A protein has these predicted regions:
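Short secondary-structure boundary segments
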Residues: 35-36, 73, 117-118
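Active-site neighborhoods of divalent-metal-dependent phosphate/nucleic-acid chemistry enzymes
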Residues: 67-112
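Short, well-structured N-terminal submotif of metal-dependent ribonuclease cores
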Residues: 1-33, 46-59, 131
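Acidic, PIN/NYN-like endoribonuclease modules and their adjacent C-terminal/linker elements
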Residues: 103-131
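A generic structural signal for short hydrophobic patches within well-formed alpha-helices
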Residues: 8-9, 38, 120
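Short active-site oxyanion
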Residues: 28-31, 64-67, 111
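Anion (oxyanion) recognition and catalysis
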Residues: 25, 62, 107
Length: 131
């Protein structure tokens, strides 16, 4: 499965559904994260919790066995197409920059995507249900 930034942040920020999101992360195999989403998650968590937040992210990644996948040219093109089809200001899904890379990795690996919210459910990507 591919993990979107929103799922990691739900766990790190201890949002109400954090236990269920953490359970979904642990249930998935393999667990992949786009390098673009790692940076996005780092920026958000460190802006809220400082460098300690970054360390919490690193620990979550390590303990969960999440593999970071580099963005290649095919994923970049898939992300461009995703933005054209589902991007903010173009479609109700309103995918942002990071969302487009999560979408691209899921599409390129033919894997479902774990996320929070309702943005990706308005696209054509397969979704991981949160219990």
């Amino acid at each position: 499965m591919v993990i979107d930034t929103s799922a990691l942040l739900a766990v790190l920020l201890q949002e109400p559904d954090a236990p269920r999101v953490a359970q979904a992360i642990e249930a998935g195999s393999p667990r992949l994260l786009s390098a673009a989403n790692l940076l996005e998650a780092s920026i958000v968590i460190e802006s809220r919790k400082g460098e300690a937040g970054g360390r919490e992210l690193d620990l979550l990644m390590y303990r969960s066995g999440i593999e970071v996948v580099a963005v290649d040219q095919d994923q970049a093109e898939t992300a461009r197409v995703a933005w054209r089809r589902f991007g903010k200001g173009r479609h109700p899904a309103a995918l942002n920059y990071g969302d487009c890379f999560a979408y691209a990795l899921a599409r390129s690996r033919r894997m479902p995507l774990l996320f929070r919210g309702n943005d990706f459910s308005q696209t054509d990507i397969d979704c991981v249900p949160v219990p």
